[in-house]
Amino acid sequence: MSDGLIVDLYPLDRPVDWPVYLADRRWWGAIFKLTQGLDYEYSAWAKRQRDHLLTSPRYGVDLFDGWYHYLTFHQPGEIQAERFWTYLEKIGGERSGTLPAMVDVERGGQRVASPTKNQVTGITRKFCDRYAKLSGRSATIYGGELLRALGCKREEMGGGRSAVALYASELHGKGESTAQFLARTGTDLEHTMLWQTCAAEGAPTGPFGYPREAPGIGRVDINVVILPGGLESLRALAG
């Protein structure tokens, strides 16, 4: 295994033993949940977690922090982006070592029972466009089943790259190639930064030879960095 690994964390995950996690150089950082819609924010928790990364000599070299917003489909996307940005600024803003923001686009927890392609694409685009104006960067779009079901496309949603969830041993469905699977998810290999291979809950999954638990954490959402260029590309994104 040569690809780097990054975990997703939110307040209900297991507590992290940060010295143990940071000592293993296979792990290149963490992406923290910061906000959800216009209703929830986790800035106090997020800042406490972030401080462990910022004080590491690895930070900005082979260790990065990232922040994600859980998008809600019944609230304006641009206002969600402004709220996300306000809380990110509150905990120190984007640093040289911070990955572009990630917007989580999925079905779970939504008040809209049957979202349409136009609705999801439009709200995500509003979020991404507003984030781009605030930060000068393009957001990463995280998604899986919903994007495939609706036929949503990364470019139409305004994302600069993708993070794809598929809990399987290989990055494709039965009888298709990776390229075909990513096309169904609205992206391509050149623009895919992360493959989320394991979740904190459910049966352990993932490709052969890759960990299904993180040191100092245990079961957690695990992402493999598959962005072409690997660490150098990730470092450039976080610069």
Spans of model-derived segments:
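Aromatic-lined carbohydrate-recognition surfaces of secreted/lumenal glycan-active proteins
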Residues: 64, 68-70, 134-150, 164-166
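Basic/polar, cationic surfaces and motifs that engage anionic cell-wall
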Residues: 115, 119, 136, 142-145, ...
